[in-house]
Design a protein with these regions (language model features):
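Short beta-strand segments at enzyme active-site cores
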Residues: 38-42, 125
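Active-site neighborhoods of divalent-metal-dependent phosphate/nucleic-acid chemistry enzymes
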Residues: 60, 78-122
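Structured helix-beta-strand junction loops
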Residues: 33-34, 76-77, 133
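Alpha-helix capping/helix-boundary segments
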Residues: 8, 43, 87-88, 110-111, ...
């Protein structure tokens, strides 16, 4: 199963983003397809934080618009929204021991641990920091 990182969601929403068209097509294709795909809950909240932040975008996305974007995604029958499960503490420990992720990278470790716990093996992201987490194949859909 493929999972999406926050940046794909942000690029799909923000038309001025360099990768907007590609991200929008990717997201629309996954949402309308039958193959299971996933987003970890921390990415949902990070999307809201980024697109509605005045310090990031001028003007920022209106909160109601951002929420409606998410509600439309949530209607996709093939989407799996992933959170911490029963094995999360042990998976978190393994991910942190292996990656030595700390500081700002702890957030990425949280996402990686959720995905690994749920058996996700491929993450689509433009964030190269995820390459440090063994057990996740990282694909940048914007690189040729």
């Amino acid at each position: 199963m493929i999972a999406l990182d926050t940046n794909i969601l942000v690029y799909a929403r923000r038309t001025e983003a360099t990768h907007h068209a590609v991200a929008y097509r990717l997201l629309a294709g996954l949402a309308s397809g039958s193959a299971p795909w996933a987003i970890a809950w921390p990415c949902i909240y990070e999307f809201l934080r980024v697109v509605t932040h005045q310090g990031v975008f001028d003007p920022p996305t209106d909160l109601d618009v951002a929420i409606e974007d998410l509600m439309m995604l949530f209607e996709s029958p093939s989407l799996r929204l992933l959170g911490e499960g029963q094995q999360h503490a042990s998976v978190m420990r393994q991910v942190l021991d292996q990656s030595r992720a700390s500081g700002n990278l702890a957030h990425d470790a949280h996402i990686a641990a959720i995905l690994i716990e749920h058996g996700v093996r491929e993450l689509w992201t433009a964030d190269r920091d995820f390459a440090r987490f063994s057990g996740l194949k990282v694909q940048d859909p914007f690189r040729n």
